[in-house]
Amino acid sequence: MDRLFADGTVNAAETGRGPPLFLFHSLLSDRASFDAIAPKLAQSFRVVVPELPGFGRSRAVAEGFAAIADRMAELVEDAAGGEAAIVLGNGYGGFVALQMALRHPAIATRLVLADAGAAFSEPGRDAFRAMAAAAGARGLPAITEVAMRRLFAPEFQARHPDLMRDRREAFLRTDPEVFRAACGALAELDLRPQLGGLEVPVLVLVGEQDEATPPPMSRELAAMLPNARLAILPGCAHVPQLQAPEVFLAAIGDFLRES
């Protein structure tokens, strides 16, 4: 069931009963990327899957990346209703979750950061600048195949044509200006100086084949956080919860149960 939170600015699907668990989607995908794992998680948690600001029915934020993190903190505070919350972010959603937790230390008791990081390498920053420029000049169709390659390995794409058709359509529904702004923010973002102050337990996951946020980014993130553990998912790329849902659920299960 969809509900509006944060004074009507954030739309989210809500299902299940139990402690609140929030799932933040990536930039190159949408909240449907969690469809394969949400039903299982809803057996133990109240699962809240928002559309990030500027996606779907959620209102865009014009003030930059920190303001997006603040908006999502409003969502978590509103939807959790005072209960201890766990936040899981994939890709861009992981960066948002990390920035949110750094700016609002009491907002979550645990974080799962899947295929994210604290800062991109210079080649990674250049890739975002190039995608933003291409999207501005020729529209999202010009970079759709680049986006899909960043999400899934070619072998996976070849084996799942129907899924890939759905993922391309989802990407093309993204607001181009929201996409360009997010690319610009990620090209400049560097959260590393703040990581030492984040005390909550963090599970850092990454697909071994992830080209969008390669494993060295997750290794660096886990090493710089005071209370983090790292898991590398074999055979997975940037959206492991969609590519290998059972593997992903097994990887996060113990960490979630510890809460």
Write out the residue ranges for each language-model feature:
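Gly/Ala-rich beta-loop-alpha elbow adjacent to hydrolase catalytic centers
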Residues: 89, 93, 97
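Flexible "cap/lid" loop of the alpha/beta hydrolase fold
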Residues: 98-103, 107-138
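Conserved acidic catalytic loop of the alpha/beta-hydrolase fold
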Residues: 67-84
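Catalytic histidine-centered segment of alpha/beta-hydrolase-like enzymes
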Residues: 236-245, 249
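Catalytic histidine neighborhood in serine/cysteine hydrolases
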Residues: 219-239
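Conserved alpha/beta-hydrolase catalytic His-Asp/Glu region
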Residues: 122-126, 138-196
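Short beta-strand/loop motif that positions the catalytic acidic residue
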Residues: 198, 204-206, 210
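Conserved HGGG/HGGXW glycine-rich cap/lid loop of the alpha/beta-hydrolase fold
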Residues: 8-59
